[in-house]
């Protein structure tokens, strides 16, 4: 005879189910469980007196007979594809199955086999997301990897050589020698990583050798001269090798205006960095490029969201990042031309409309690498409070908005950079780069981060404690961050040309190299999931007012944001 329990009791035991609602951190964003792939009455749970015991929820089947390496039980999955509850089976560092776990000898409808060789991660009451992907990283210091991983980032794409002045300002690694050294360093870092080569050149030879040396993309930056000739040449090389191009355009409009840059694109796919303009780009109207089908528009977290402090902090940041001097009037004018409250306010709304597709950090070069996810959800919360529910959201939940915003740092950057066959979503066949969150700490402090199916970092108490939880409790590296586990659970993204030339053996790295694919004509703005709006854009050159399809885009700065100081008292 079936037993009945209250929803509250059920959620406490097995996590929320269909119709239950969950608040994300201390925001006003509410998600609702859309479907449940587990079976009522047959839920599996680990622990004393619980289900996953020999002959009960645990079968006799070996790994060779189909048992999983790891099962995450009763997880609430938050993904661009939906918000649903399921068990997740991991095998060989990948997501093997999503569905119902247990013992097929004693339970009906089992798709995920738990055997004696299966580890269990309790997902009850936890939210599981794909690891975040940050596609705007200045590799200034290796310590960024620790900050990013502990914030839920599992892939970093960018360039640099350390605290050299070229790297402090620009997101690229110049030349094959530097690229080789950087890729060699990745063996010591628990993170999936890709490198941008420098894209600023008017002839192809130097760019081609960087792609062959392992660059998975090329970066055009105004500080190296972002001329129409350089743009055209860089895109031509990228088309030949199937790698993405990221661009930071000409703030001073010296080599041309935004129309000249658009003409140089010639309709070819390109990833536009900090499209709002405060981070750089044609002043004052680079924001217009988000209307074009070949432009994949992103913005960075220093302007996310628009607050009462945003304008004030930007000027000094910009002077440091771009090697400018406060004693030179022209340098000050350059900096001030980029900081416009009108376009920053419009940026909030364009993200909420789905016209801006990607959020990234701009790490240590105006942005904060550990705050990319926080700033994304702060923007979503601000927009809900100022603009209300989205038309596609159902009454009582913010599922559509949540899916739109999580896509900005998971699936869309993966698609943009040819990595979506490996990462970017909670999907069967992809790498098990997963983040577990306590809903109260969602987006702020992960409960656990898995890289390639193994735990890389997690909150942990005193190692001499009698249990794992005595203070001081803070995020620490786990076994997945050490030794050869580190090189066997994370990868380096490179070009197919580098793979063909045997780069791994040539430079002697242990990490697996994986080629990026489909970064050029096969993708465009239409490929940006839940973020493919292309409104007709106008920018007033005198007032900087921004309009989309004739509507003025403006919003007030806020003086309080969620996911902030209350989470960082200790």
UniProtKB/Swiss-Prot annotation:
Its cofactor is Ni cation. Ni(2+) 1 binds at residues 136, 138, 219, 362. Pathway: Nitrogen metabolism; urea degradation; CO(2) and NH(3) from urea (urease route): step 1/1. GO terms for biological process: urea catabolic process. It is found in: Cytoplasm. Pfam families: Amidohydro_1, Urease_alpha. The modification N6-carboxylysine is found at residue 219. The active site is at residue 322. Carboxylation allows a single lysine to coordinate two nickel ions. One of its GO terms (cellular component) is cytoplasm. Heterotrimer of UreA (gamma), UreB (beta) and UreC (alpha) subunits. Three heterotrimers associate to form the active enzyme. HAMAP family: Urease_alpha. This is Urease subunit alpha 1. It comes from Brucella suis biovar 1 (strain 1330). The gene is ureC1.
């Amino acid at each position: 005879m079936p037993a009945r329990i209250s929803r509250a009791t059920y959620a406490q035991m097995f996590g929320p189910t269909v119709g239950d609602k969950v608040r994300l951190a201390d925001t006003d964003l509410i998600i609702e469980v859309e479907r449940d792939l587990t079976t009522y009455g047959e839920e599996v749970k680990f622990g004393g007196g619980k289900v996953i015991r020999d002959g009960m929820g645990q079968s006799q089947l070996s790994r060779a007979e189909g048992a999983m390496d790891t099962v995450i039980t009763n997880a609430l999955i938050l993904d661009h594809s939906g918000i649903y509850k399921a068990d997740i089976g991991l095998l060989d560092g990948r997501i093997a199955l999503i569905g119902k776990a247990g013992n097929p000898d004693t339970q009906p409808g089992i798709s995920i086999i738990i055997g004696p060789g299966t580890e269990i991660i309790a997902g009850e009451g936890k939210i599981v997301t794909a690891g975040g992907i940050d596609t705007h990283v200045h590799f200034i210091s290796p310590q960024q990897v620790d900050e990013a991983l502990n914030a839920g980032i599992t892939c970093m794409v960018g360039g640099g050589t350390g605290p050299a002045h070229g790297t402090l300002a620009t997101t690229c690694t110049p030349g094959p020698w530097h690229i080789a050294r950087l890729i060699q360093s990745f063996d010591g870092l628990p993170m999936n990583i890709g490198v941008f080569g420098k894209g600023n050149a008017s002839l192809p030879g130097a760019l081609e050798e960087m792609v062959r040396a392992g660059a998975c993309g090329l970066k055009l930056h105004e500080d190296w001269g972002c001329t129409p000739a350089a743009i055209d040449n860089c895109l031509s090389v990228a088309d030949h090798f199937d790698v993405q191009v990221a661009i930071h355009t000409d703030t001073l409009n010296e080599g041309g205006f935004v129309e000249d840059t658009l003409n140089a694109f010639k309709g070819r796919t390109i990833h536009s960095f900090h499209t709002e303009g405060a981070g750089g780009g044609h002043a004052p109207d680079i924001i217009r490029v988000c209307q074009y089908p070949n432009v994949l528009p992103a913005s960075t977290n220093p302007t996310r969201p628009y607050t009462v402090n945003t304008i004030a902090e930007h000027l000094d940041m910009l002077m440091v990042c771009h090697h400018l001097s406060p004693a030179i009037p022209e340098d000050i004018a350059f900096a001030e031309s980029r900081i416009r409250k009108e376009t920053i306010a419009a940026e909030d709304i364009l993200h909420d409309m789905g016209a801006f597709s990607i959020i990234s950090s701009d790490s240590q070069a105006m942005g904060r690498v550990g705050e990319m996810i926080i700033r994304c959800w702060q923007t979503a919360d601000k927009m809900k409070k100022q603009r209300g529910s989205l038309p596609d959201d159902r009454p009582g939940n913010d599922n559509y908005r949540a899916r739109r915003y999580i896509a900005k740092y998971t699936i869309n950057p993966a698609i943009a950079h040819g990595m979506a066959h490996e990462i970017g979503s909670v999907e069967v066949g992809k790498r098990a780069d997963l983040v577990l969150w306590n809903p109260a700490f969602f987006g702020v402090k992960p409960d656990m981060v898995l890289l390639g199916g193994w735990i890389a970092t997690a909150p942990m108490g005193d190692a001499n404690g009698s249990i794992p939880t005595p203070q001081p409790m803070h995020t620490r590296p786990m076994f997945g961050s050490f030794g050869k586990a580190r090189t066997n659970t994370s990868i380096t993204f490179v070009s197919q040309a580098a793979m063909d030339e045997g780069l791994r053996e040539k430079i002697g790295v242990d990490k697996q190299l994986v080629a990026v694919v489909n970064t050029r004509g096969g993708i465009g703005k239409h490929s940006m999931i839940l973020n493919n709006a292309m409104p007709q854009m106008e920018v007033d050159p005198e007032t900087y007012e921004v309009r989309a399809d004739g509507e003025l885009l403006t919003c007030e700065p806020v003086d309080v944001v969620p996911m902030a100081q209350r989470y960082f008292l200790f």
